[in-house]
C-alpha cells in the first residue's frame, strides 16, 4: 500500500532509516557480502551436497552478483558484433552455466576459511572496485578484487574478478576465447564451454 506524504512527514526518522537500509542493501559491498555469505554456507554444507545441489544453491547468488550477459560479451570481445543474435543468446546461456559450475566445482569443501570485504569501495571512471580477501585456516590471505558496474535501474554487479589482486579473469577468458573463435567460430566456442561445463560436473 502506498505511503502518504503526510505519514512520512509525521514519521521522518523511520522513513529515513528505511531508505538508508534499502540503499545499503544495494551497495557494492553488500552485494559481495551476500554472495560470500551464500558461498560460505554452501562450503560448510558441501560434504552433504552433490554438485547439482551446490549449483542450485549458488546459481541465484551468482546471477544476482554477476552481470553474466555483459561478462559474456566482454570475454568474447570484438567478435561479439559479428555473431547472430541466436548465437549470442546461446553463448550467454552456456557461459553463465560454466561460470556457476566453476564455483560449484571449486568450493566443494570447508576447512575453516572465511572472507573479508573492505567496507569502502573505490570509484574509478569505469566502475567500482571492491577489495576482498579469502583467509585460509592457516592465516594465508588470497586477495580477490571485484570490478563492479552500476547500471540504471539495478544494483551494482560484478563484471570482472582479479585473482591474487592482479590477474584479470576477464582478460584471461578473452585471450583464450579469441583463438577458439578464430579457428572454430561460435560453434567451436560453444563446444569448448559445453565440454568444460560437463567436465566440471563430473570432475
Task: Label the model's feature ranges.
Residues 1-14:
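N-terminal secretory signal peptides and thylakoid transit peptides that target proteins
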Residues 20-24:
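Sec/Tat signal peptide C-region and signal peptidase I cleavage site
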Residues 27-103:
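Early exported N-terminus immediately downstream of N-terminal targeting peptides
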Residues 45-49, 82-86, 112, 187, ...:
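Surface-exposed, polar/charged faces of alpha-helical domains
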Residues 80, 97-98, 136, 164-168:
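Solvent-exposed loop/turn segments at secondary-structure junctions
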Residues 100-142, 193-196, 200-203:
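Surface-exposed, charged secondary-structure patches
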Residues 143, 147-172:
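Short beta-strand edge/turn micro-motifs at domain boundaries
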Residues 162-203:
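Low-complexity, intrinsically disordered terminal/linker segments enriched in charged
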Amino acid at each position: 500500500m502506498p505511503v502518504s506524504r503526510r505519514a512520512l512527514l509525521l514519521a521522518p526518522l523511520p522513513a529515513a532509516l528505511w531508505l538508508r537500509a534499502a540503499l545499503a542493501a544495494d551497495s557494492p559491498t553488500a552485494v559481495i557480502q551476500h554472495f560470500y555469505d551464500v558461498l560460505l554456507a554452501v562450503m560448510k554444507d558441501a560434504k552433504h551436497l552433490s554438485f547439482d545441489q551446490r549449483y542450485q544453491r549458488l546459481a541465484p547468488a551468482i546471477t544476482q552478483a554477476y552481470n553474466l550477459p555483459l561478462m559474456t560479451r566482454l570475454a568474447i570481445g570484438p567478435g561479439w558484433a559479428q555473431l547472430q543474435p541466436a548465437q549470442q543468446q546461446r553463448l550467454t546461456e552456456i557461459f553463465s552455466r560454466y561460470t556457476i559450475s566453476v564455483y560449484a566445482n571449486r568450493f566443494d569443501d570447508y576447512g575453516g576459511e572465511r572472507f573479508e570485504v573492505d567496507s569502502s569501495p573505490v570509484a574509478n571512471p569505469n566502475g567500482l572496485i571492491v577489495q576482498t580477501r579469502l583467509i585460509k585456516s592457516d592465516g594465508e590471505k588470497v586477495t580477490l578484487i571485484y570490478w563492479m558496474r552500476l547500471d540504471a535501474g539495478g544494483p551494482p554487479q560484478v563484471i570482472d574478478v582479479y585473482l591474487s589482486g592482479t590477474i584479470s579473469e576477464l582478460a584471461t577468458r578473452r585471450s583464450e576465447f579469441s583463438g577458439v573463435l578464430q579457428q572454430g567460430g561460435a560453434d567451436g566456442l560453444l563446444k569448448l564451454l559445453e565440454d568444460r561445463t560437463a567436465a566440471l560436473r563430473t570432475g
